[in-house]
Design a protein with these regions (language model features):
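Short, glycine-/small- and polar/acidic-enriched structural segments
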Residues: 1-57, 63, 73-77, 90-96
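Pocket-lining segment of extracytoplasmic ligand-binding domains
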Residues: 53-138
Length: 138
């Protein structure tokens, strides 16, 4: 299992489980996979009418900083920001994994999609072979 996203609260938060986020503001990057992952984690723990979210920036580092500034009480992060947050004393109140799917429209050329998957696979191989070379991108 690959942890894709984590619902994170700052070190000073009194939230320890996702149920405690009922009615509290969670910053999500609407329209992106991490936002859907966040909704999945929240809706599994909180009544739908108690899920409270706001639009947050797409870049996870900026979202993390906004959470620490108090713009919202929790947000969803992915690696390497999950590790950064944990090292700073933040808590993961929920995690979810990557289901192994990509979203594409019905008009997407299958050959183009196959090329995309080959590119992702090659990128993963290169990063895993020399992580220090690519760490600055995170």
């Amino acid at each position: 299992m690959i942890v894709c996203a984590a619902l994170v609260v700052p070190p000073h938060s009194n939230v320890y489980v996702p149920q405690e986020l009922a009615g509290r503001m969670v910053g999500l990057d609407y329209g992106n996979g991490t936002a859907y992952a966040g909704l999945q984690m929240l809706e599994g723990a909180v009544r739908r009418d108690e899920v409270t979210t706001c639009a947050a920036v797409i870049h996870p580092g900026e979202r993390y900083a906004a959470m620490l500034r108090g713009a919202f009480e929790a947000t969803v992060l992915q690696e390497p920001w999950i590790t950064v947050a944990e090292k700073a004393g933040c808590r993961l109140v929920s995690t979810t994994f990557f289901h192994g799917t990509w979203v594409a429209g019905p008009d997407l050329d299958p050959a183009l999609y196959a090329a995309f998957l080959r590119g992702v696979t090659q990128a993963v191989r290169r990063i895993n072979a020399d992580k220090r070379r690519y760490v600055s991108y995170f």
